[in-house]
Structure formats: C-alpha cells, structure tokens
C-alpha cells in the first residue's frame, strides 16, 4: 500500500515554496500529498503572491495533491471569513482536521507520512491504529538526499532560511509508529 504524505499544518508549504521549484520536492518521492481544507485555507487565505503560488501549485496537481473537506475545517473557515473567530482559536486546528479526516476514513488507509515543520510531534499514541511515519522538514530533505533525488539537503535548508523561513530547524527526526507490536516499521523513501 502506498504511503500518503499528510501535512498537519501549512508550515512546510511555506518553507518549500520559498525555494525555486521547492513545492515539487513535496511530490519528489512519488507519494500522494493530502491536505485538509483548513491547511489549504491556512496557506492561501492571505491572497499574497506566495499564497497564490501555493494555490496554483495545488490546482496544477489534481492527481497528486488531494484536499479533503472536514467538518471542523469548514466551520473554522466560515468563522474566519465572517471574522468571528479569534486568532488564538486557530491553534492546532490543522492537526485536528487531519485527525478528523483520518477518523472519518476520508484519507483512506495508511501508511501515512506526517511532515512537520519542526520537532514538535503529536504523541504517537494519538495515531492509534494507523501506521505512521513522522518526519521534520529537514528530515524529509535528508531523506530526499539519501534517495538521490536532491544533491544536498543542507543547500535547500539554507535557501529556505535565507528566503524568510529562518525558523526551519536543522533537526532530523524521522521516526515510525507501528499500529501494533507485530507490524513492520513504515517506510517512505523511494
């Protein structure tokens, strides 16, 4: 079964778009990318040039990038459009919409690769029955380098940082979560 890449927040989209051709690196392993409606909204709501580039990239890859509608995502988007929500209420909405989509079966079966911007991970127990692999942005880049897809993770990380994404940490975390003790570790690299 093919691993699906899930973004629990929009941070990786902003980091990868900061580098020329960077968004295509998200598809480089040949794995489908799944976003929830709220993650897409979070990345494109401003209407800035960067947001429009992300929106255009998503639209240009309908067979590789899938946007899943969620109940919470639709409610949050409506309240943000109506300007009835507070900024503090946005905390962790992306993560919660991803787990809503998983719980409702809207994403299908795993294994899943959760791509996080930083080294703050959800408690592995939260993944439940799903075989999951958690990886940081830099861990993803290192995986691409080790697979021969890119020549240097360090160069791309440096470009991200020099193009406004200074907060992307050079932390390599790449860890599997088994759905049960008997299951094999998940893998994601080609």
Predicted region positions:
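H-loop/switch region of ABC-family ATPase nucleotide-binding domains
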Residues: 116
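Active-site-proximal, substrate-binding regions of enzyme catalytic domains
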Residues: 2-113, 121-190
């Amino acid at each position: 079964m093919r691993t699906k890449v899930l973004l629990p927040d929009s941070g990786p989209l902003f980091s990868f778009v900061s580098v020329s051709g960077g968004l295509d690196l998200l598809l480089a392993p040949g794995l489908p990318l799944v976003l929830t409606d709220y993650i897409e909204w979070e990345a494109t709501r401003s209407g800035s040039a960067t947001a429009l580039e992300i929106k255009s990239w998503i639209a240009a890859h309908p067979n590789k990038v899938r946007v899943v509608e969620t109940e919470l995502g639709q409610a949050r988007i409506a309240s943000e459009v109506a300007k009835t929500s507070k900024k503090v209420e946005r905390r962790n909405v992306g993560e919660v919409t991803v787990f809503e989509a998983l719980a409702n079966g809207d994403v299908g079966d795993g294994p899943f690769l959760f791509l996080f911007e930083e080294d703050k991970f959800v408690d592995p127990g939260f993944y439940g029955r799903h075989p999951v692999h958690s990886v940081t942005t830099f861990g993803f880049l290192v995986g691409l380098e080790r697979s021969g897809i890119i020549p240097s993770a360090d160069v791309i990380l440096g470009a991200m940082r020099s193009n406004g994404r200074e907060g992307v940490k050079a932390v390599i975390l790449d860890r599997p979560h088994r759905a049960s003790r008997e299951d094999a570790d998940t893998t994601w690299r080609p």
